[in-house]
Amino acid sequence: MQISYFHVPAEMPQSVRPSAAVVIDVLRATTTIAWALHNGAEAIQAFADVDALHTAAAAWPADARLLVGERGGQKLEGFDLGNSPVTVGPETVAGKRLFMSTTNGTRALDRVRDVPLLMTAALPNREAVAQRLHQHKPDTLAIVGSGWEGSYSLEDSLAAGALVHRLLELDSAANAAANDEATAALALWKQWMHDPEACLRTATHGQRLIRIGNHDADFQCCAGLDQLSTVPTQGEPGVLKAA
């Protein structure tokens, strides 16, 4: 398996066509996606564009849909939920389709929506995603960080490193190779692996969340390692379901 990590979607050349892709947005889209599907959401339908989201959601029964949206860390006006994993409990999301648009994560998903095997990962479902990749054994894997408005984010690289670490444990070094970005992410993970929440709070986006309110529960949820068996997987363009 050739593992390539791209800090942000724009770093991934248009000519790169991997066998599989994993999108990461630790704070907080892919963490929220994993928890929502774990808690019984029917699906997550991701949109880079809010107008397109509203059009698609309007065609869905009102009692079977939720609008989930965030810009700049704040819930979008008129939406049911913001981008917080602690708000997607089973009593809220079970059986419903979540129409979701966020500052960074859903845009990253849009960039790789044509990849044959597309999943999302966060720290809580790191092990489950690693096992699924080990099972499928793609020749080439692109791990795509969401970043923040096109810039590098520490927390996405932390989770990328955590995933690379587990993949290299599952596959011998002779069967796996990583690009420099993935190797650097692995080193970052080894630095913070015993206290990932501290890394999330140190990150620029973590500091941004701290400034706009009390997000202690979000930090704890986003930093929880290997808690979920859910692997959000794209079945049709833009639609993720538990697998």
UniProtKB/Swiss-Prot annotation:
Reactions catalysed, as given in the entry: (2R)-O-phospho-3-sulfolactate + H2O = (2R)-3-sulfolactate + phosphate
Stored HAMAP family: ComB (MF_00490)
Family to which the UniProt record says this protein belongs: Belongs to the ComB family.
GO molecular function list: 2-phosphosulfolactate phosphatase activity; magnesium ion binding; sulfopyruvate decarboxylase activity
Gene that produces this protein: comB
Cofactor annotation: Mg(2+)
Keywords annotated in UniProt: Hydrolase, Magnesium
EC number: 3.1.3.71
Protein name (record): Probable 2-phosphosulfolactate phosphatase
